[in-house]
From Swiss-Prot:
UDP-N-acetyl-alpha-D-glucosamine binds at residues 32-33, 40, 246, 251, 334, 342. Belongs to the glycosyltransferase group 1 family. MshA subfamily. Homodimer. Catalyzes the transfer of a N-acetyl-glucosamine moiety to 1D-myo-inositol 3-phosphate to produce 1D-myo-inositol 2-acetamido-2-deoxy-glucopyranoside 3-phosphate in the mycothiol biosynthesis pathway. SUPFAM superfamilies: UDP-Glycosyltransferase/glycogen phosphorylase. It comes from Thermobifida fusca (strain YX). It is an enzyme of class 2 (transferase). Mg(2+) binds at residues 321-322, 324, 348. This is D-inositol 3-phosphate glycosyltransferase. One of its GO terms (biological process) is mycothiol biosynthetic process. It catalyses: 1D-myo-inositol 3-phosphate + UDP-N-acetyl-alpha-D-glucosamine = 1D-myo-inositol 2-acetamido-2-deoxy-alpha-D-glucopyranoside 3-phosphate + UDP + H(+). InterPro entries: Glyco_trans_1, Glyco_trans_4-like_N, Glycosyltransferase_grp1, Mycothiol_biosynthesis_MshA. The gene is mshA.
């Protein structure tokens, strides 16, 4: 899945990193996904780091400390260490404020590396633009390649903003432009993201690798729907529409609520069995308090059907997926769509917006349905068919299991290692690195 620079594949196979510095400045890999700024990127970093360590590659993940009670080092897994770097005041800061604390963060990283007895780093992999701003001076100081994953891009997000949402600042756009110029290797989650890097940011195709994210196929598996419904305290005949993710305008949980209200207009007989579950916490602009979503449900006349649930560990989340009739992912922007893949791995079809990486995460018409735009009426029509045509829905569920089986984290790491080897090889040819 990872692209290779022509003519370098054979040579790059002999170069292997022994120790990697990953940077996730604005959100800790120890945070619960679905809360604050923690989401699919956090899952990505943790799952990749664990599997790299299983292959003998040590990974240190640098993040900003948010409490004086946090120790400088936390072992996340054998071979994976989270390093909490003091930079700026403790507590949660808005991402727009973090740019002011890049210098102390960089200083903290350099000091941590200088004091560490385990040897130097072979490569720096940064996640999100803020991490990249801290990562490129560190990589240059150490003389190692910089690999960067955007995860989301300002220009792309600004082209698909939800109504009332705040555009990404020009400062971020300029920062991403700089990273495209400075990084030795850019990792795209999908072919669509790779094209965006090339077309909107002028990235050289030879320095872009497409590596699909994965899913934990040992946790997210098919199981008894009846048992999962019982665990959630729901009757066996429940029609469960599921949303998983941070409660923010970008993720568009309001579209699901409006679609559910429209669904009942189409078929009022569904009301006694319908439940809409929103599993996730507050984040980002808009929806400053979860109760605002409750107000919307009340205004739509479906407050009695909506369950607002806090983010939960994967061992619990899997039961929501198994119990769901369909998982709805109506995002305005999505770099990949991990929730959609997790749902399919559990055998539950997906109805999603045709944006970003979701056409890769969901096989339209096979494992789910992709919808152009965010009109609740369009979602309601598809959901009604999903509910009233169980055989169609079951075929999609089975196809989703097959589709997700090809998106393992092991395959992701295979692709990343190919990109790492290529970056290391190119770096050796052009010492000092770019």
């Amino acid at each position: 899945m990872a692209s290779q620079t022509p003519g370098t594949e054979a040579q790059s196979q002999t170069v292997q990193p022994g120790r990697i510095a990953a940077i996730s400045l604005h959100t800790s890999p120890l945070d619960q996904p679905g809360t604050g700024d923690a989401g699919g990127m956090n899952v990505y970093i943790v799952e990749v780091a664990k599997r790299l360590a299983e292959r003998g590659i040590a990974v240190d993940i640098f993040t900003r400390a948010t409490s004086f009670e946090q120790p400088p080092e936390v072992e996340l897994a054998p071979g994976v260490t989270v390093r909490n770097i003091a930079a700026g005041p403790y507590g949660t800061l808005d991402k727009t404020a973090l740019i002011n604390y890049l210098c102390p963060f960089v200083h903290g990283m350099l000091r941590a590396e200088a004091e560490h007895l385990g040897g130097s780093y072979d490569l720096v992999h940064t996640h999100y633009w803020l991490s990249g701003q801290a990562g490129w001076p560190v990589a240059r100081e150490w003389g190692v390649p910089l690999v960067h994953s955007m995860h989301t891009m300002a220009r792309v997000k600004n082209m698909s903003l939800a109504e009332g949402d705040t555009p990404e600042p020009e400062e971020r756009v300029r920062g991403e432009d700089a990273l495209v110029a400075l990084a030795d290797r850019l990792i795209a989650n999908t072919d669509d993201e790779a094209a965006q890097l090339i077309n909107y940011y002028g990235a050289s195709p030879s320095r872009v690798s497409t590596v699909f994210p994965g899913v934990d196929l040992t946790t997210f598996t098919p199981g008894s729907r009846a048992e999962s419904l019982r665990r959630l305290g729901l009757p066996e005949d429940t029609i469960l529409l599921l949303f998983v993710g941070r409660v923010q305008r970008l993720k568009a949980p309001d579209v699901l609520l409006r679609a559910a209200a429209r669904l009942l207009e189409l078929n009022p007989s569904l009301r006694d069995r319908l439940v809409v579950a929103v599993v996730g916490g507050q984040s980002g602009t808009g929806y400053r308090e979860p109760w605002l979503l409750s107000d919307l449900a009340d205004s739509l006349g479906i407050a009695d059907l909506v369950r607002l649930e806090p983010p939960c560990p994967r061992a619990e989340l899997v039961h929501y997926y198994r119990a769901a009739t369909v998982t709805v992912v109506p995002s305005h922007s999505e770099s990949f769509g991990l929730v959609a893949v997790e749902s399919q791995a559990c055998g539950t079809p997906v109805v999603a917006a045709r944006v970003g990486g979701l056409p890769t995460a969901v096989r339209d018409g096979v494992s789910g349905v992709l919808i152009d735009g965010h009109d609740p009426h369009d979602y309601a029509n598809v959901l009604h068919r999903m509910i009233t045509e169980p055989r169609w829905r079951e075929r999609m569920g089975a196809a989703g299991i097959h589709h997700a089986s090809g998106l393992s984290w092991e395959s992701t790491v295979d692709g990343l290692l190919a990109a790492y080897r290529d970056a290391l090889h190119q770096c050796r040819l052009t010492v000092p690195c770019r």
